[in-house]
Amino acid sequence: MSKGPKSIILFSDGTGNSSAKLFKTNVWRMYEAVDLGPPAEGKRDQISYYDDGVGTSSFKPLTLLGGAFGWGLQRNVLDIYRYACRNYRDGDDIYAFGFSRGAFTVRLVVALIASEGLVRSSSEAELDRKSRAAYHAFRATFLPRRLQWPTRLFRRARAVIGAWVGRLRGRAAYDPADNCRPPIRFVGVWDTVAAYGGPITEITRAIDNWIYPLSMPNYQLNERVLRARHALAIDDERDAFHPLLWDEVHETALIKAKKVDERRLEQVWFTGMHADVGGGYPDESLSYVSLLWMMEEAERAGLRTLTVVKDRFVALASSYGPIHNSRAGLAAYYRYQPRKIAAWLDPVDKKTLSLRDPAIRDSRGRSRGLLRCVNVHESVINRIATGTDRYAPITLPETFRIIPPQLEGENAPQADNQTPVPPPQTTTPQPMVSREVRARLTEPSTAAARAAVTEPIWNFVWCRRLTYFATLTATVLLLLLPLFVARLPTPPLLADGRTWIGGIIRLLTLVLPAFASKWVEVYADNPFYFFLLAG
């Protein structure tokens, strides 16, 4: 490795995602695509660090805690931060990529670097101590929104005890003035979601409000970040997985003050569910679309990637790929709530107030949005216009801006068995849809007509939400049935008086764990109430 400046590239994967998983995410694919070999003359060396997502512990209780409440987030943040501290030298560039809660993680890492800088150390023990001190100083502004004094008291006691122990051991107190404060060259994230992900939003929000602060104090992008890109999913239907956007209202103020470049931040929406955009499903063709967009944006910021790896991604990308069901199986217990993108727009549309995060407010305490405009990738329009599945997302707002495809996107010319040598590459991206199609979706009169047609469909969304709550209530009653079944009136007997149905229910003991036998016996003895709730 040369002794000149280098690029440090940090990766944090999503919940339950790791290098050992069979189906990879875009974070892992980006990690694979980074060129870590000897650079050409005048280019930088590149080193990278990949961190498994939260909820990947081999100890299952920790896996559940990580999946529901972000347990292990601090460890992930500090692991990535220490790698940057350990390897940074003056003049180095820093890149960071993440998906889902891994996106939340790298945004915290970037905010930590921008706020506290990178600590200097001469040993791993010193690095461990200083990095924890930097993290605690950074987290000082993270407080429960309602009940704050217990958190303040605990942190004050921890600081006093830590300072006392440090003096006994002859250690200097943590001083952020000793840290180096590099700019962040590029941050690329896919569909950032909150650190907690329980299916009942009120429970996780109550923890954040009253017990332990997990959310960010704000959604502003620090001025030390030179470029940031956010790929977002249009079609996910889980309330707990609504994305954490960057604050474009604050960004506009920075641009007007000429503190940042006007193209510094870009957030673009893509077809698909959460993992259709960030990756992780067996059929992965749709996720490559946002990956190629992110790769090209990072390359413009100086990142070097391997052509042989990227060519494979280009060949496999398809905006016509299958859209999966984000609420399949047990995920059906995540609250049903499609992403109404208009709810994030500023100024506020009063019709969307019930869908907004109540914590997002202006300096006067009034609810406000985070988006100035909605950017939709042209691949979305291509699927709407020419797709084979009648794709028509109801979540798009009335007006939006179409982002043209990248130069090496899914429509880039490729070699095949008929054309062994691909056509020459052009210097401008090839459009995916005609001007007429673009105009038909964005022209004011047709946009208003489209919005008028899709708005009544949200009435069916509310009906499905009622169905969700009915299902959740029936499930809870079914689980609690052994506690109150003795108080219920005797149900009507079957017409022929037979009780064979209980024997069939008892067959469940053959496939369920032993601790479930108590419930199975109650259900078998009370088949009327079992089928009333389960049916």
Where are these regions (language model features)?
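Active-site- or binding-pocket-proximal scaffold segments within functional domains
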Residues: M1-G535
